[in-house]
């Protein structure tokens, strides 16, 4: 049985309406190979993974907390108020944006890129939670209101 993304978005919307927030997305790290994946509406941590929590690693906030601005109806996300390094050994792997309707956008980054991305909220309003994952210092987040 396949479940459409519309099902997840509808379910997330219903959860958010009841709870008043963004509660659908969780981010997990594979314990064997270190890969990071997101999951929607997951109550159980997948086998071989652990759920990541924002800010659980002690590191420089100025290089890790996503900075979010709205420019020309787009969300510009820059990782850190001081630019984060993007080296082979230390870089930002992903930036996620979770909108109040439960929709999630993701940008994958690689060493050598700038630690930033521009997302199109497509007219969405409400609370937006932005996450980023540093391969050395874990998951970080910030929230804004659109």
Predicted regions located by residue number:
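Short, positively charged and aromatic/hydrophobic N-terminal segments
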Residues: 3, 7-14, 21
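Long, contiguous interaction/targeting segments characteristic
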Residues: 8, 21-51
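Transition segment at domain starts
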Residues: 37-74
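Short amphipathic, basic-aromatic surface patches that mediate peripheral association
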Residues: 79-87
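Extended low-complexity, serine/threonine- and proline-enriched intrinsically disordered segments
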Residues: 91-101
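Short strand-edge motifs at loop-to-beta-strand transitions and within beta-strands
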Residues: 115-119
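Short acidic/polar inter-strand loop motif in beta-rich domains
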Residues: 135-142
């Amino acid at each position: 049985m396949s479940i459409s993304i519309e099902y997840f978005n509808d379910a997330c919307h219903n959860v958010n309406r009841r709870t008043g927030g963004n509660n659908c997305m969780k981010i997990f790290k594979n314990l064997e190979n270190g890969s990071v994946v997101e999951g929607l509406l997951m109550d159980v941590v997948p086998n071989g993974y652990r759920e990541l929590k924002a800010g659980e690693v002690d590191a420089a906030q100025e290089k890790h907390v996503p900075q979010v601005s709205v420019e020309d109806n787009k969300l510009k996300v820059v990782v850190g108020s001081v630019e984060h390094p993007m080296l082979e050994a230390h870089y930002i792997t992903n930036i996620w944006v979770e909108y109040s309707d439960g929709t999630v956008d993701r940008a994958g980054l690689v060493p050598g890129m700038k630690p930033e991305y521009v997302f199109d909220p497509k007219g969405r309003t409400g609370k937006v939670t932005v996450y980023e994952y540093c391969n050395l210092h874990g998951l970080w987040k910030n929230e804004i209101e659109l």
